[in-house]
Amino acid sequence: MGATGSSLAVNNTGDGTAVVILNNKQMTTGEDDIDPAGQDTVMGGSITGGSNVTFIKEGTGTLTVGGTMDVETLALREGNIILNGTENSLDTLTLEGGGLTISGNAEIETITGTEAGGTLAIQGTLDLTGTSSINNGAITGTGSLRIREGAELALGGEARLDGTSVTADGTLTLTGTESGAISGLSGSGALSMNGGSLSISSATTSSGTFSGTLAGSGTLDISGQATQYLQTGNKDYDLAVRDGGVLVLKGTADAPTLNYNSITAGNNGTLRIEATGDAQGSANTTLNVENITFQNGSTTELIYNFNQDAPFGAPMLTAGTITVQDGAGFLLSNMKGNAAMN
C-alpha cells in the first residue's frame, strides 16, 4: 500500500470482525528490509471498509489520504493519519495514542479514548453526530468543530480543547482538570461545566453567538481578536473580557434578563450590553450580576433601544457590588439601525 492514486477497499463476508493494520510498511531496494516502524505514505485514493471491518493505525509514520476515508471503526495507536478529502465518514474513532488530522471535512458518530489518549487535529470541519467521551488526549487545530443537535461531546480527566471554533447545537460537557481554549462558541445547544475555565481567544478576527443553555458552573474568559455574543446566562458562571476581546451580552425577546455571578471587564477589553432589538416592542437587555469590576483600560458600552416609549424604564445593569477603577471607560449609544437618537 502507498502508491499515489491507489485506493484500499475491504469487505468482510464472515461472521467475525476483520482487522486491517495500517502501518505504512514500505518495501525498499538494495540491502534494506521492510521498515517495521513505517514510513510516511501518501494515498491519492480512498480507504473504505464494509460492516465489521476495523482499521488500526500502527507504526510511527504518517499516512495521508487524499480521497475519502469511509470506515466503520478506526483505532489510532501510533503515528498519524491526515485526511485531505471532503467527505470522510467514520462510525467510531478510538484515540489510543496516535493522531488524526482532518484537513478537509469529516463526519464522525462516536469518539472514544483510552488511557494513552491521542490527538485529533481539526484544520477543516468535523461534525459529531453521536455520543463521544474522552478522558485523555486533545482536540486541537484552527478548524471548526460542530456538535450536531442531539449529539454530545464530553471531555473529562486530562482531555482538553485547544484552538478550534465550536458550534454546540448538541451538548459540550467539560468536567476535566485541563482548562479549555477555543476560538469561538456558537450554537443553541448546551455548554456544561464543572467549575473549570474555558478561554475564548483568537489570533485573527472571529465571532461566535451562543444562545443555548449554560449548565453547571464555570468561567468564560474572552480575549484576543475574539468577539463573543452570549444570549443566555447562569448565576453560577463568571465572565471576563480582556486584551482585545469583545463580550456582547444580548438578551432575547423571551428572556431579556441575563444572570451571572461575576463579570470582570479587564484592560483593553470591551464589555457590551446590547438591547434585544431595535423594534418599538424590543426590550433593553438587563444584566443582573452579583459582582462586576471595570478595570483600568476597559470599555463598557450600554446600547439602548431608543425606539421604546420608555427606554430608561428598566435598568441595563443591576449588581450587588460594583467596582470602578480609574481609567475605565463607558459609552452610552443607540441601537444600530434605530433612528430615534442617531
Q: What kind of feature is each model-predicted range?
A:
Residues 1-342:
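Beta-strand-rich extracellular passenger or scaffold domains
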